Design a protein with these regions (language model features):
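Adenine nucleotide phosphate-binding catalytic loops in nucleotide-utilizing enzymes
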Residues: 100-171
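Conserved catalytic-core segment of NTP-binding enzymes
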Residues: 78-82, 86-103, 108-115
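Short, low-complexity, polar/charged sequence segments that are solvent-exposed and flexible
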Residues: 55-57, 74-77, 94-97, 114-118, ...
Length: 171
């Protein structure tokens, strides 16, 4: 099981919905793998201390308390989320930024109504430590999705997907 922990306002559901669609696609490609989404304030972080996983910062953080990100987790954050960036500066966790700037790790290359090209701008390692080279991903959307939830969901997809040749994705 790969845990995905969401940190932010519970009523902000756009990231949750996009992640659920991405996880459904991942289950079809990576048969036998399970992906579980948890809300930070509803789970015990100690349960994940020996796990690999993904920690996603939502656009609005809401509650203020010390954030603990398990050691084997990769953080995913919007480049515009200054509160999350402040949290990440205080702890030693690898983070992938998502946004519309060429400085971001995952960035929009082109966009139309239900199709998006997203560029991975630099080398990253997936959840198993395997190298993923810079490349473009074509995403066919089943419904309109805002930019940050889309980038977050695609980043989780790329980090968890075993088939690194899979660069045309639907969710």
């Amino acid at each position: 099981m790969i845990p995905i922990i969401l940190y932010g306002k519970e009523n902000e559901t756009s990231v949750d919905k996009a992640l659920r669609r991405a996880c459904d696609s991942l289950r079809k490609i990576n048969k036998g793998k399970e992906f579980c989404i948890f809300q930070y304030d509803e789970c015990d972080i100690e349960d994940f201390k020996n796990s690999k996983g993904i920690f996603v910062f939502k656009g609005s953080l809401g509650f203020k308390r010390d954030v603990i990100i398990p050691k084997g987790f990769i953080a995913v954050v919007s480049a515009n989320n200054h509160s999350a960036a402040s949290i990440l500066r205080k702890i030693d966790v690898f983070a992938i930024t998502c946004g519309t700037s060429p400085k971001d790790t995952m960035s929009i290359s082109s966009l139309d109504y239900l199709s998006v090209v997203v560029s991975l701008q630099r080398i990253i390692r997936n959840i198993d430590g395997e190298v993923i080279e810079p490349q473009d991903f074509i995403v066919h959307l089943k419904e309109e999705t805002a930019i940050y939830p889309l980038l977050t969901a695609l980043t989780v997809f790329v980090l968890c997907n075993k088939d690194q040749n899979e660069n045309i994705i639907s969710f």
